[in-house]
Design a protein with these regions (language model features):
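Structural beta-alpha unit
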Residues: 1-4, 81-148, 248-296
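Small/aliphatic-rich secondary-structure junction motif
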Residues: 2-92, 176, 187-258, 301, ...
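Gly/Ser-rich helix-loop-strand patches that form or flank binding pockets
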Residues: 5, 18-33, 128-188, 269-310
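N-terminal start-of-chain detector that recognizes signal peptides
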Residues: 9-12, 96-98, 119-121, 154-155, ...
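Short amphipathic alpha-helical surface micro-motifs
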Residues: 20-21, 103-109, 164, 175-178, ...
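Short Asp/Glu-rich motifs
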Residues: 49, 102, 159, 233, ...
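Short, well-ordered alpha-helical scaffold segments within catalytic/effector domains
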Residues: 133, 167, 204-207, 265
Length: 310
């Protein structure tokens, strides 16, 4: 996470109703600690406009001049209306769109910008791309996002079906993104966060970000460590105590400390269902193998929201 004064959150709009539900969670973060919010809709390249980026850009600018909404703008407008209802956007609503040039992308993007009451920036962003995952990751890098929120309304896939089922867009983004990603399912504030820890360097690297997020959210924190075998329970207990002490040293008293034995992904998924968010550290595996890691297995199995912390 960067040293910016405010947390920056990129919310992907268009992945189903879960993306809109996540806006309540973003508003909760903004109430607790002023955040910058970008709402992004990525539309696949129009089939009739694939001859080149310049043709796409000129055609889209002409459409805007004619007063016609581009595909995707309605989704962003719906998200904007939700933020207005939540009080995140107030005052006069600017309905104009501005075209921004992007290096390496001749089509650019269309942007509408606001300021919220605390001084944070809110932007609506419309991009066109042949590959949605690449565009989202690129936008997150340009925005210097700390967190990407992407909705996922697909049913969890387990067993042999995982080998033949196309990977969800949310998990593709989580595998390629350089910042933390929340795979959002029923993402509602108020039910606490479950932080999953181990006694290793990955957890130690995650803890400062988990503490920062806890301060930003103001949510109660529970800690969980899972030992695969009973003889490793003591290691799990040490991991939970190490994490608890780190939180206490940073002004947060964990709500509970949990130690369990079993398959980590199964235990985390089961216990995590009662929480608003499950937090797990990213795997060191390369992007093409992350689906076999505990973090991404949990994100694929869970019926609620999972944050993969990077």
């Amino acid at each position: 996470m960067s040293d910016k004064l405010s947390t920056r959150i990129l919310v992907c709009i268009g992945g189903g109703p879960e993306a809109y539900t996540g806006l309540k969670f973003v508003h909760r973060l903004s109430e607790e600690s002023c955040v910058d919010i970008a709402l992004l809709y990525v539309r696949p390249v129009d089939s009739g406009l694939k001859s080149g980026g310049m043709e796409i850009r000129v055609a889209r600018e002409n459409v805007l001049d004619w007063g016609i909404e581009l595909p995707g703008m309605a989704h962003l407008k719906k998200a904007q209306d939700i933020l207005v209802d939540l009080g995140e956007i107030s005052g006069e609503i600017d309905e104009s769109w501005h075209h921004h040039e992007l290096s390496g992308d001749p089509t650019g993007e269309f942007v509408r910008e606001y300021r919220n009451a605390c001084g944070g920036r809110i932007s609506l962003r419309l991009r066109t791309a042949e590959d949605v995952t690449t565009a989202v990751v690129d936008e997150a890098d340009r925005f210097e996002a700390d967190i990407i929120i992407v909705g996922d309304n697909t049913k969890p896939v387990e067993g042999l079906r995982k080998l033949i089922t196309p990977r969800q867009l949310s998990l593709k983004i989580a595998a390629h993104a350089n910042c933390s990603v929340i795979v959002a399912r029923h993402l509602e504030p108020g039910h606490g966060h479950l932080v999953c820890v181990q006694n290793n360097d990955l957890t130690r690297a995650m803890l400062p970000k988990a503490v920062h997020h806890a301060h930003t959210c103001g949510c109660p924190i529970s800690l969980l460590s899972v030992a695969e075998k009973e003889e490793k329970r003591s290691e799990a207990e040490e991991a939970v105590e190490m994490a608890a002490q780190f939180f206490r040293d940073n002004g947060i008293d964990p709500h509970e400390q949990l130690v369990e034995v079993g398959d980590p992904a199964e235990v985390i998924t089961e216990l995590g269902y009662d929480f608003s968010l499950i937090m797990v550290s990213e795997s060191e595996k390369p992007w093409f193998a992350k689906g076999f890691s505990v973090a991404h297995d949990v994100a694929a199995r869970a019926r609620n929201s999972v944050m993969i912390v990077k």
